[in-house]
Amino acid sequence: MNTDVLNQQKIEELSAEIGSDNVPVLLDIFLGEMDSYIGTLTELQGSEQLLYLKEISHALKSSAASFGADRLCERAIAIDKKAKANQLQEQGMETSEMLALLHITRDAYRSWTN
């Protein structure tokens, strides 16, 4: 497992809380969400892309934390904080950083589950 991206302890805690049989089901949903985020964030441009980045960053704060995706969670928190302070710009690096982390995190989970 890529410990730089995925927090094994949080995944084990989640498994203990909800049952190990439920983790693959919820993880599949989370992976699907990441695929959707990647696709939509890539397709949108300008202010629509920025608005979507704000939306997914807010959503990812909790879902990434629940699944032990610590780097993704940290980035989502930072972007959400900037969004609330109106400090995000259309040509900012946040979108490319979020896309890169979504890809890295999704791929790390897929290789972990295979």
From Swiss-Prot:
Residues 19-114 form the HPt domain. It holds the Pfam family Hpt. The modification Phosphohistidine is found at residue 58. Keywords: Phosphoprotein, Two-component regulatory system. InterPro entries: HPT_dom_sf, QS_phosphorelay_intermediate, Sig_transdc_His_kin_Hpt_dom. PROSITE patterns: HPT. One of its GO terms (biological process) is phosphorelay signal transduction system. One of its GO terms (molecular function) is protein kinase activity. The keyword Phosphoprotein applies. Monomer. Phosphorelay protein which receives sensory signals from LuxN and LuxP and transmits them to LuxO, at low cell density. LuxN and LuxP transfer a phosphoryl group to LuxU on His-58 and this phosphoryl group is further transferred to LuxO. At high cell density, as LuxU could function to establish an equilibrium between the aspartyl-phosphate of LuxN and the aspartyl-phosphate of LuxO, LuxU transfers phosphate from LuxO to LuxN (and probably LuxP) and finally phosphate is drained from the system. NCBIfam families: Phrelay_LuxU_Vib (NF041948). This is Phosphorelay protein LuxU. It comes from Vibrio harveyi.
